[in-house]
Amino acid sequence: MSDRLKPLIGTAATRPLSREEAEFAFECLFEGEATPAQMGGLLMALRTRGETVDEYAAAASVMRAKCHKVRAPHGAIDIVGTGGDGKGTLNISTATAFVVAGAGVPVAKHGNRNLSSKSGAADALTEMGLNVMIGPEQVEACLLEAGIGFMMAPMHHPAMRHVGPVRAELGTRTIFNILGPLTNPAGVKRQLTGAFSPDLIRPMAEVLSALGSEKAWLVHGGDGTDELAISAASKVAALEGGQIREFELHPEEAGLPVHPFEEIVGGTPAENAQAFRALLDGAPGAYRDAVLLNAAAALVVADRAAHLREGVEIATDSILSGAAKAKVALLARLTNAA
């Protein structure tokens, strides 16, 4: 331990840290050079004042540099949310990932176990028979053979072991709730990323731009979820060519009906997996339409679809043809053979 972080804790409470100061601070955290009290002090100073784009970018760049990296196919996309919306929906981004992969777009999905719901991405995949506790080489093999791979955050970010206990003790949101979607170990350049607050979508788009993303949609559902909503309009910050455009998106613009929010509320991992299997078998309803909407957006971001309605058509075919279901079965086989 050292006292190198101490001076920056007070500074962080009174003014934004420069990119260089923030990088230094997070180097201290990730190298285990700070005491738990110092870590907590810094995280809460940032939270209370409000983190800046430079601070997000600095933390993400240090975290990316220290992760166990994965080589992904060209054009791979990540489909992920911050979590923390407290809505407990069915696993929409997880199902979306398989639908998009079934449409021929490589998906390098970064995720974790449940943080804000009864069933996070890793919980749902485990229930579906996948082994999520695999390392970078096995994930790369999955991406090459199946066109989809799941990167379990703790398997790829060992530096987080220093911070994890402090986060658990604080029991409140910190900058790390935002960093997951910004620190994909495959370094993908395209993202469909959900945020738990509409106030985060533009800053997160700015961070992804600073970190080299080519095209990304940052979204927040009007129902309060960290994905495109099927029950209301959603806010979008679309990054492309270094420019950010903000707009609202309604399900009907994609040719999809509006459904009551209650129809996509999830349950236990087993219950969510049952709904996921029904969706893969073609069961219609709010869950499928929510996945189709998010998959359509991901296909637009990946340049697989020119517009949302075309994306819905491609995503529907991925489900009804059995392609999405086949991706789940193949990934289950590959991960359990690893």
UniProtKB/Swiss-Prot annotation:
GO cellular component, one term: cytosol
Binding-site residues, Mg(2+) 1: S93, E227
Single Gene Ontology MF annotation: magnesium ion binding
GO biological process: L-tryptophan biosynthetic process
Origin: domain of life: Bacteria
Cofactor: record remark: Binds 2 magnesium ions per monomer.
Documented EC number(s): 2.4.2.18
Sequence positions that bind Mg(2+) 2: D226, E227
Binding site for anthranilate 1: G81, N112
Region forming the signal peptide: none
Annotated metabolic or biological route of this protein: Amino-acid biosynthesis; L-tryptophan biosynthesis; L-tryptophan from chorismate: step 2/5
A UniProt-annotated Pfam family: Glycos_transf_3
Binding site for 5-phospho-alpha-D-ribose 1-diphosphate: 81, 84-85, 89, 91-94, 109-117, 121
Role of this protein: Catalyzes the transfer of the phosphoribosyl group of 5-phosphorylribose-1-pyrophosphate (PRPP) to anthranilate to yield N-(5'-phosphoribosyl)-anthranilate (PRA).
Subunit structure, interactors included: Homodimer.
Family recorded in the similarity comment: Belongs to the anthranilate phosphoribosyltransferase family.
Designated name of the protein: Anthranilate phosphoribosyltransferase
Native organism taxonomy: Bacteria, Pseudomonadati, Pseudomonadota, Alphaproteobacteria, Rhodobacterales
